[in-house]
Amino acid sequence: MTGVQTCALPISIFQGGLQTGFYNMATGDEPIVKDLALNYAISDNYHQAVMGGTGANHIVLGTGFAASFQNASGKAVAPPPGEIENPNPKPGTNNNYTQDGYGSGSVPNTGGSYSECANPKAPGVSTIDKFLAKLPYKAMANCQPGRYYLLNNYNAGYNVDGTLNTSAYTVPPQKTDYVTIGNELSAHHISWGYFGEGYNNGHPSFAYCPICDPMQYATSIMTNPSLRKNVQYGLANFISKAANGNLPAVSFLKPADDDGHPGYSAMYAYENFVARAVAAIQGNPKLWRSTAILITEDETGGYYDSGYVQPVSFFGDGPRVPIMVVSPYARRGFVDHTYNDHVSILKFIEANWGLKPLTSVSEDNLPNATPQAYVPKVRPAIGNLMTMFDFRDPHFGTIKLPVRHWSVPAAAAHPPTAVFTLR
């Protein structure tokens, strides 16, 4: 056969992309991550809390649970048929889901991934129920009858300015059964803020992530100007507030497309973002002395993981993702083995400020996992990250991180960086 052979690439079905990646720090890969790991604390047993994508994992980060399909009054109703997840294998495919959103199903141009997980007759539910029933412990049963929960990526029901989001692939405004850490902090007069790169002074660029702020889904926040202002910040606001010493006590900082996501970004772009955030905090000595920076990523990006995954509930857990704790109080050069996931960040905030779990069904109700046990002795359980700190032996020095210039094209999924000021 001679000549150039061409063929059309298959259309993406959005059911997994890149499977593996390899980074070699011994040859210079990820120098900033390496420096942070050597000087502060990391975990080899931290997980995404939902076996799903970016949106669902950001929602659980702020609520300990999930968003659901609701009507204009906040009543639980069924979504259009084309938006209901059906993981049963589609005949004639390599185990592709029968219906997995974004235009599939009986309703064109909709699609999505809602599951009525309290109904064993709903697609895919009985299989998970049977799996959970065989566990040597009782998983958390937090699916509520009649509710269809979001498992993957949908835009928030509100734009960041508080107007209704009328675009496709949008979860309805969350009027009932949706309590965020922002609500809880405000109720206890603790300052908080969400800083999204690309916010652009109220005119979000394409790079701004519309699915990544868990507070932006909540009617209670987005229709209340005094609460809504807490989500109307960008990267420049974060840098200036850190310099001036008026950063909110709990601050969520979100990169745009310099997020290191597999397939379209690069790790050294993400490292530059992290280095800039760390430098902003360390550049204010008073702020640095009372701050914990938690650096994590929303989900694996499709990468395979061989580690233990604890079945916690219908929703997860999922594979391991990185977390680093950068703080004067972080254990130096420490690798934590305690079982943690994204809800551990909620539990950390709640432990630090003496707050209660958000709701009766949120996963911050779970007990703390056994310290340094890769598999918790009592399950289900997740840690609160306190095992990564030693408050008796602070080290207030700072490190200079190498920064390289880099830019990446706009894309769609972003890992979160959380910054918390300790009380």
Q: Which stretches of residues belong to each language-model region?
A:
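N-terminal pro-sequences and low-complexity stem/linker regions of secreted or lumenal proteins
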Residues: 1-423
